[in-house]
A protein has these predicted regions:
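Active-site environment of divalent metal-dependent phosphoester hydrolases
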Residues: 55, 75-78, 98-105, 121-122, ...
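Accessory terminal helices/loops
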Residues: 16-29, 198, 202-274
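Active-site neighborhood of phospho(di)ester-bond hydrolases with catalytic His/Asp-centered motifs
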Residues: 70-72, 90-101, 114-119, 154-157, ...
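Active-site HxH/HxHxD metal-binding segment of metal-dependent hydrolases
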Residues: 75-145, 234-241
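Conserved beta-strand hairpin/beta-sheet module of binuclear metal-dependent hydrolase folds
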Residues: 32-85, 164-177
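Histidine/acidic-residue-rich catalytic or RNA/ligand-binding cores of hydrolases
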Residues: 167, 184-190, 223-231
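Metallo-beta-lactamase
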Residues: 20-35, 39-41, 107-160, 167-169, ...
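Bacterial Sec-dependent N-terminal signal peptides
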Residues: 1-20
Length: 274
């Protein structure tokens, strides 16, 4: 896990800041501590930014009866107590995907965590010390928080188990790193990403979803249906040989090429061209 986290620390912040994603927030700060800042998106939704991995972001989503926390950041001490200071509702921890900047040490504060089973391949390396119960999400299920429903949509690409969560009534969702926050590390392959982008863009258009809050939120870099469509087209172009991308000799994890278009990047390698 340390090696993987080092890789993320090396390539994600530099690439994102190079793309012009400077943190500029308009949301009101409701909690500020040494490890995380929480800001209020609306009356019952908050986003928290950790300080270790390119503003790794977690989201607290509250209903009338209970709340969910999407991701836990890299290392936020006493995260459970911090969250309890924001909402009085019981909180369930859910991961958008299993990577150490989203399921880091902070998950130890919670007795259980829900993940997409496809990311179990990452658990041994990236959640090695978790003693709680691991439970599985179901594609297409709806999480009822009491007066607020959250749709669960599997969106593989960044990882096999990347998952997006949608509040249809509010017109927005939360996508973790599925669409890259502007800088997508494509760990599966182009074909998988194409299908994910087709599915999500169709869903967003059908239900009028305006934006997806990403896993590294910096205030302006929300995912839109246009961006999702663009990513799918970029992946299709790579697969067909229409786009070649550029060599990225500093790329790690085998992602030694990068395609930059429409203000976003796809990091990929030979293994992803299928």
């Amino acid at each position: 896990m340390k090696k993987f986290l080092f890789v993320l620390l090396a390539i994600v912040p530099l690439a994102m800041f190079a793309q012009g994603f400077k943190p500029t927030y308009e949301e009101k700060v409701v909690y500020e501590g040494p490890d995380v800042i929480f800001r209020q998106i609306d009356a019952h939704t908050w986003e928290g930014n950790g300080h270790l991995m390119a503003n790794e972001t977690l989201y607290l989503i509250e209903g009338e009866e209970r709340a969910i926390l999407l991701d836990a950041g890299t290392d936020i001490k006493e995260l459970d107590k911090i969250v309890a200071g924001i909402t009085s509702k019981p909180v369930t921890l859910i991961a958008t995907h299993v990577h150490p900047d989203h399921t880091g040490k902070s998950i130890d504060c919670f007795p259980e965590i829900y993940i997409n089973a496809a990311d179990m391949v990452n658990v041994a390396e990236m959640m090695p010390n978790y003693k709680g119960t691991i439970k599985y999400l179901r594609d297409g299920e709806t999480i009822d928080l009491g007066g607020r429903q959250i749709d669960v949509i599997f969106t593989p690409g960044h990882t096999p188990g990347s998952t997006t969560f949608i509040d249809r009534a509010a017109g927005y969702g939360f996508s973790g790193d599925a669409f890259g926050s502007g800088n997508l590390l494509l760990i599966t392959n182009c074909s998988t990403l194409i299908l994910t982008c087709q599915r999500m863009s169709a869903y967003m258009q059908k239900y009028g979803i305006q934006k997806l809050y990403p896993g590294h939120y910096m205030g302006k870099n929300v995912e839109t249906v246009e961006r999702v469509i663009n990513l799918g087209e970029m992946a299709q172009g790579l697969l067909e040989g229409k786009y070649q991308g550029e060599a990225n000799p500093k790329g790690m994890l085998g992602l030694n090429r990068v395609l930059t278009m429409h203000g976003v990047r796809i990091n990929y390698g030979e293994a992803q061209l299928k």
